[in-house]
């Protein structure tokens, strides 16, 4: 069974950073790009960026450049996203999703990030 297992919820203070994970199983990790998506309360999904697990190449939504950093660890079939300089606007659910030619065919359950002092 193809699965993406995301790390648990995070409660962080303004100005801090957070790094979440997305562990893939049931398929060859390097064969598919990994996308990251933000779901803010009451708002539509926003594409953050994607990463090619084969070579680590990344592409970012301009809005999230400098905010998000995407990396992978091929040895553990895990993708990571670090968010920096957090503010209340970054409070959201963040999803990883496997990309099949811009069709997101497998999704993680999401990681909830709450930014609060």
Curated annotation (Swiss-Prot):
The keyword Disulfide bond applies. One of its GO terms (cellular component) is immunoglobulin complex. The sequence of the light chain of this IgM myeloma protein has also been determined. InterPro entries: Ig-like_dom, Ig-like_dom_sf, Ig-like_fold, Ig_sub, Ig_V-set, IgHV. Glycans are attached at residue 55. CDD domains: IgV_H. GO terms for biological process: immunoglobulin mediated immune response. Disulfide bonds join 22-96. Residues 1-116 form the Ig-like domain. It comes from the Eukaryota. This is Ig heavy chain V region MOPC 104E. Keywords: Adaptive immunity, Disulfide bond, Glycoprotein, Immunity, Immunoglobulin. GO terms for molecular function: antigen binding.
């Amino acid at each position: 069974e193809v699965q993406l297992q995301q790390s648990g919820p995070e409660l962080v203070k303004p100005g801090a950073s957070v790094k979440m994970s997305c562990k893939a199983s049931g398929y060859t990790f390097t064969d598919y790009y990994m996308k990251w998506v933000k779901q803010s309360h009451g708002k539509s999904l926003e594409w953050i960026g994607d990463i090619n697990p084969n070579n680590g190449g990344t592409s970012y939504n301009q809005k999230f450049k400098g905010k998000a950093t995407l990396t992978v660890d091929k040895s553990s079939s895990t993708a990571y996203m670090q968010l920096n300089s957090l503010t209340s606007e970054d409070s959201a659910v963040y999803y990883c999703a496997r990309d099949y030619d811009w069709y997101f065919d497998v999704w993680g359950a999401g990681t909830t990030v709450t930014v609060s002092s």
